[in-house]
Amino acid sequence: MNNPDDVLLINRFLRQQHVLTLCAGSGMDMWCASCFYVFDENQMALFLMTEKHTRHSELMLINPQVAGTVATQSRTIALIKGIQYRGDISLLSGDAEQAARNRYCRRFPVAKVSSAPLWQLNLLEIKMTNNALGFGKKLHWSRVEPL
C-alpha cells in the first residue's frame, strides 16, 4: 500500500521538474539519455519526445523496461531531492499520441516545430530521497494495479 503523504510529495516533485535521465538496455548494450518530460499524475506516467533512430530509442523498442532518475542540482546536502524510477515505455500513436503532443507542447512550446515521436513511460516503482525531510529520508511508491 502506498503512503498518501509519500505520493503527494513525489507527485509535487515530478510536477516541479522537467528533465529526466532515462536508461535503456538490451542484453549487454545499455545507454542513457536526458529528456524533457511532462508528468501525468492520473496515469503516473511521463511523456517524453525522442527520435526513434537514437541509440536509447532503438534499445527501448527492443526492451521497453527502463530505469532512470529525476534530480535537483542542489549544492547543499540538506536540500538534496531526487527520484529513482523504473517503468515500461512505449511509443504512442493515434489519439493518445496527439493528446500527449498537445500537453507536451503546452509545457515546451519550442517542441511545436518538432515531428519527433512521443513516448509514454508508465512508472512502476519510485524511490525518492528527500533530505529536506531529514538526511537520507526515503519515500516510496509502486504501481499496485496492472497496466
UniProtKB/Swiss-Prot annotation:
SUPFAM superfamilies: FMN-binding split barrel
Domain of life: Bacteria
Chain segments annotated as transmembrane: none
Family: Belongs to the UPF0306 family.
HAMAP family reported in the protein's UniProt record: UPF0306
Name the UniProt record assigns to this protein: UPF0306 protein YpsIP31758_3570
Organism: Yersinia pseudotuberculosis serotype O:1b (strain IP 31758)
